Amino acid sequence: MAYNTPLTSTTEFGSMKVGTGFTSTNGTVSATLGLLNYGFFTSSIPQTNPVANAVNLSTFNLTGPANGISIVGGTAITVVNAGTYTKLFTIIAAKTSGGTSVISIWLRLNGVDVVGSRQDLDLINTLSLIFTSGNFTLDIPAGGNIQLCWSSADITVVLDALPAAVTPTRPTGNSVKVTLTRIS
């Protein structure tokens, strides 16, 4: 296919204007992809509940794939760019006491509890492990951070990590996992 007039050039506008994100070389237009921010953060260690009914901030000691999002101070998942983000978390909860205990899990944005983000989980009797996950979508300002908080009145409640196992060989399981992805 041939054109009498180029689509665009660096000196003249054709059918389109070269601007941010677009380049033109000999009539060929190229656009860069806008890579959104993302991050995967996890903890390979158990996290205890040393004080009943106190706020525990989930800590992270491992970073997976990430772009524009990082961990600050071990607990704050911090974004470079403002935007709408979706957060997905998974925890492994356990307890060693009898009866029913409640673990509350919620989100903080820049140190302030996020309304509507709490979920409660009943841990019944002495149970080995229970997995739970949740998600939340929110606007985060540039330089802002989120934290995954949890609490329980029962000090035997922990976020537990699984060791590697054999017969058959199985990998470790981390106590907390969070994926944060910018969606706009």
Q: What would you call each of these model-derived segments?
A:
Residues 32-184:
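Extracellular jelly-roll beta-sandwich "head" domains, especially the C-terminal globular C1q domain
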Residues 1-33:
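Surface-exposed, low-helix, low-complexity loop/repeat segments of extracellular attachment proteins
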